[in-house]
């Protein structure tokens, strides 16, 4: 069973009738995702892309049985939308939205504490590419045609580096079980550690490619967890080897501020944890191939 989404997974779009919601809904439908409807307050009862529109996520879940959603709403409304999804029983929610205030992300994470581990919604993002299980379903904004179905899991803070890895692997005949873009913000819904733990128990995943960058302790925390708890091999790439300290590089979370947050330091610490490191982005696929050949 794939991580997070299957071909049958029923999906909602929050912000369904807006420009971005409409565009990516069409792309997801073309890919084969089971999009059963969407939510736009005030437009309940209408049809959009031949699918029902609801005023609330609760109504949408009640009438469609949806278990996954994706947010295409303005940053100011993203926190309330995510919490509404959790309260409605959504199991997996992807927040594509860029620019969500850090205080709002803290509010979401605090709100989610009211749920038990088994009831808690998985939030992926914000500022991310989303999730794709090639050949099954897409809950995101990635170009689906570059993904080949296979048995390597990808986790990436950067959307475009995730795409690059997928394309390289496809050209080498290596497929992907699930690819998850966790986003480049300092505070996100799911961490590297959260996702590699799921891949470890996934019977469709044999190895994991983890694509990180400067800033924050997430990559090293995942490596330390893997060293003590995982058997599946992990390949890593850390972007930002030449990035100076104290300067934001692209993503809001990509800033080196403490020991263990630079690319060089992360690479050394991950090597100590048994992670195989790709030296540069152009050989991510080749590095995965080398690791798989040793299994």
Model region roles, listed by residue range:
Residues 1-295:
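Catalytic-core regions of core metabolic enzymes
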């Amino acid at each position: 069973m794939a991580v997070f989404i299957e071909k049958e997974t029923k999906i909602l779009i929050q912000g369904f009738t807006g420009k971005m919601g409409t565009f990516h809904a069409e792309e997801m439908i073309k890919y084969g995702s089971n999009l059963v409807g969407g939510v736009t307050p005030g437009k309940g009862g209408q049809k959009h892309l031949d699918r029902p529109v609801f005023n609330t996520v609760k109504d949408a879940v009640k009438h469609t049985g949806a278990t996954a959603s994706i947010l295409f709403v303005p940053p100011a409304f993203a926190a309330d939308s995510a919490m509404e999804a959790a309260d409605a029983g959504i199991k997996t929610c992807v927040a594509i939205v860029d620019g969500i205030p850090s205080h709002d992300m803290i509010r979401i994470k605090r709100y989610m504490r009211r749920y038990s581990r088994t009831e808690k919604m998985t939030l992926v993002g914000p500022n991310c590419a989303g999730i794709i299980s090639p050949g099954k379903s897409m809950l995101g904004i990635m170009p689906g045609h570059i993904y080949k179905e296979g048995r390597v899991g990808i986790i990436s803070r950067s959307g475009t580096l995730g795409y690059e890895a997928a394309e390289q692997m496809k050209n080498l005949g290596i497929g992907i079980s699930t690819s998850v873009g966790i986003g480049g913000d300092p505070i996100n819904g799911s961490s590297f550690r959260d996702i590699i733990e799921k891949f470890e128990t996934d019977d469709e995943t044999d190895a994991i490619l983890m694509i990180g960058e400067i800033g924050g302790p997430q990559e090293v925390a995942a490596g330390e967890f893997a060293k003590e708890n995982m058997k599946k091999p992990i390949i890593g790439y850390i972007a930002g080897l030449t990035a100076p300290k104290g300067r934001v590089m692209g993503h809001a979370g990509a800033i080196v501020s403490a020991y263990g947050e630079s690319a060089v330091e992360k690479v050394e610490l991950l090597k100590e944890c048994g992670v195989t490191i790709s030296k540069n982005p152009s050989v991510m696929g080749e590095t995965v191939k080398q690791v798989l050949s040793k299994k």
